[in-house]
């Protein structure tokens, strides 16, 4: 079994190396979050200030909520894609007589090795990276620029454990499928593995939707004296239009998380819908659209990083714009502290996910050449497939931003003024352009590596 694990890792080295890159970056971000939070908390405790301690906890929890969640999603989806892309090999194992239970153990062991190596390298690289990352904290004006960096004793093992956990969780579904699907069916579906939405994904959606529904009613419920005192201490007042606008706009992020939890019901219909609006007269466009739809389960994973990057930018800045339009003293202070690691893992994840299916894309390009397609058509089809992935993620992010703007306008009662102020057009154009450029460039990268 050990021999098969290592031989298969070498045989599919290109795919596993991309996964290792994502796991290393994810581990580095996890290590940076742990070290930065612990360093800020240690310094605040040394100052003996309850305000500084509270600020450290707020920043740390925000990092976990935004950057940590994005890292978890991208790590798990990337490793799931890696396993799904090797479905043909797993089917051949079953043909050779290897039991399904052993195949599942082998796959999870391989993913565990990648998570372990990524966690170790991420923990090591997080130490020099945390000093660079803390430059984004200067906008807080709370902690010193030369904040002492302290990695706790549990930092390295926790980084490794969390990285491995996210990797293994993402691979459990594809590994279970590889062990249970009949080998002939798996061989037929090797280029386009089928996926299904599981019960726990709907549980996540239900929790997120409950938050969306309950938010408008919370401010109308009577509060006790203790609750009023706590809100006054924190500076929050949900009866203030500015606070209501910012709270309403932040609901877009909950909606985005809920939608990304069930990509088969959100991203797949979105991809099918908007690509159907463009006529398929061009052979390059027709081939790119057909490939993206045919590999829908793999395409969903590729779209997720771009969707996260655009949705995070849109919803956060929508909350700030809505608050400022209603008189709240909000700013984007602290956005870089969560935005930089999120954009970093999103970019690396997007590049890796597109590159990992490059072999299948090149095989399809070769088939197009056999039936008479020109080289220019094949290359255009490859680039257009990257465009489809990026545009689908961009449209998802724009939809999340629009949801935030509408929710803020309705919840605050600010109307059109809040709606217009909630849409950060310039930043959305910038992030969308970067996502599009990355996707198009990465579709060419695997061909250059051959």
Give the positions of each predicted feature.
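Interfacial "coupling" helices/loops that link adjacent transmembrane helices in transporter permeases
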Residues: 4, 15-17, 73-114, 348-387
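C-terminal structured domain segments across diverse proteins
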Residues: 323-440, 444-447
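Loop-to-helix entry region at the N-terminal start of transmembrane alpha-helices
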Residues: 52-71, 155, 249-255, 325-347, ...
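Small-residue-rich transmembrane alpha-helices
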Residues: 28-39, 79, 112-141, 156-180, ...
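Selective transmembrane-helix segments that form parts of the transport pathway or gating/packing helices
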Residues: 16-20, 71, 107-127, 164, ...
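Short juxtamembrane loops and helix-capping segments at transmembrane helix boundaries
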Residues: 40-56, 130-154, 225-242, 327-333, ...
């Amino acid at each position: 079994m050990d021999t098969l694990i290592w031989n298969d890792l070498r045989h599919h080295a290109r795919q596993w190396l991309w996964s290792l890159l994502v796991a290393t970056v994810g581990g580095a971000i996890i290590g940076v979050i742990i070290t930065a939070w612990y360093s800020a908390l240690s310094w605040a405790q040394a100052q003996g200030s309850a305000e500084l301690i509270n600020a450290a906890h707020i920043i740390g929890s925000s990092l976990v909520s935004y950057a940590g969640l994005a890292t978890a999603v991208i790590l798990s989806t990337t490793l799931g894609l890696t396993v799904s892309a090797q479905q043909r090999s797993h089917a051949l194992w079953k043909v050779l007589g290897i039991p399904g239970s052993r195949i599942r153990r082998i796959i999870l062991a391989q993913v565990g090795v990648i998570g372990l190596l990524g966690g170790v390298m991420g923990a090591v690289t997080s130490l020099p990276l945390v000093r660079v990352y803390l430059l984004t904290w200067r906008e807080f004006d709370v902690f010193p620029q030369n904040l002492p960096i302290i990695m706790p004793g549990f930092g390295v093992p926790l980084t490794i454990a969390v990285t491995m956990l996210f990797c293994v969780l993402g691979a459990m579904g594809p590994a279970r499928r590889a062990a249970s699907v009949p080998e002939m069916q798996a061989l037929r579906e090797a280029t386009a593995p089928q996926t299904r939405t599981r019960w726990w994904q709907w549980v996540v959606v239900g929790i997120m939707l409950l938050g969306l529904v309950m938010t408008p009613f919370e401010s109308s419920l009577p509060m006790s004296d203790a609750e009023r005192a706590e809100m006054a201490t924190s500076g929050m007042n949900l009866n203030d239009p500015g606070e209501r606008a910012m709270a309403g706009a932040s609901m877009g992020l909950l909606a985005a998380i809920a939608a990304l939890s069930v990509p088969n019901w959100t991203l797949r219909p979105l991809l099918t819908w908007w690509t159907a609006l463009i006529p398929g007269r061009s052979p390059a466009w027709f081939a790119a659209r057909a490939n993206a739809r045919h590999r829908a389960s793999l395409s969903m994973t590729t779209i997720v990083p771009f969707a996260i990057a655009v949705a995070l930018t849109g919803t956060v800045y929508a909350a700030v714009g809505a608050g400022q339009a209603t008189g709240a003293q909000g700013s984007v202070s602290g956005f870089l502290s969560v935005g930089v690691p999120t954009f970093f893992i999103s970019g690396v994840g997007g590049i890796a996910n597109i590159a990992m299916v490059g072999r299948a894309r090149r095989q399809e390009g070769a088939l197009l050449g056999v039936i008479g397609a020109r080289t220019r058509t094949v290359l255009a089809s490859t680039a257009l497939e990257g465009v489809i992935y990026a545009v689908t993620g961009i449209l998802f992010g724009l939809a999340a931003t629009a949801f935030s703007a509408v929710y803020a306008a309705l919840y605050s009662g600010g109307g059109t003024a809040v709606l217009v102020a909630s849409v950060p057009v310039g930043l959305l154009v910038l992030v969308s352009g970067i996502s599009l450029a990355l996707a198009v460039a990465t579709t060419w990268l695997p061909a250059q590596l051959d």
